[in-house]
């Protein structure tokens, strides 16, 4: 990967893909292929991370798979190898989300001294089919003014 710009120098991003490990998210089927939400969210997260790094940002990839990188296949095979920075991912949703927040908070406590801008980006794919059968896309931005940590409430 080649850095093409320093536009994001001094920025640090925590990129988190949805589901993973024991939770594949929703599973769809196209012909003989199963489509698992977590595999596509992970692939998109890696592509985003690469693009941020090319612009000079530091990127921490929170959900990781030791074997799968960016894949150019139309259909991505499922695995349950994903970890949360080396730790097994719990099946329980609240525990899974808290684990991710804990990892980000620990990294942020170290990184905030070295970077002028730190943000977490969560990638989640919702494959629920609706009546109009169109894909929806949402961006949720959380602004923290006084809280020291991200929290699950």
Report residues per predicted region.
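Catalytic-site microenvironment of enzymes
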Residues: 1-153
């Amino acid at each position: 990967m080649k850095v093409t710009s320093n536009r994001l120098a001094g920025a640090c991003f925590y990129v988190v893909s949805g589901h993973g490990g024991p939770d594949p998210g929703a599973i769809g089927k196209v012909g003989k292929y199963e489509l698992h939400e977590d595999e596509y969210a992970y692939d998109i997260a890696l592509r985003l991370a690469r693009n941020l790094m090319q612009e000079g940002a530091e990127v921490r990839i929170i959900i990781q798979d030791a074997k799968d990188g960016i894949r150019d296949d139309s259909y991505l095979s499922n695995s349950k190898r994903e970890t949360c920075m080396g730790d097994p991912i719990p099946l329980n949703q609240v525990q899974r989300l808290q684990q991710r927040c804990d990892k980000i908070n620990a990294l942020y406590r170290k990184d905030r001294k070295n970077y002028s801008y730190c943000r977490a980006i969560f990638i989640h794919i919702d494959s629920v089919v609706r009546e109009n059968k169109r894909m929806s896309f949402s961006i949720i931005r959380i602004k923290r003014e006084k809280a020291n940590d991200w929290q699950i409430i």
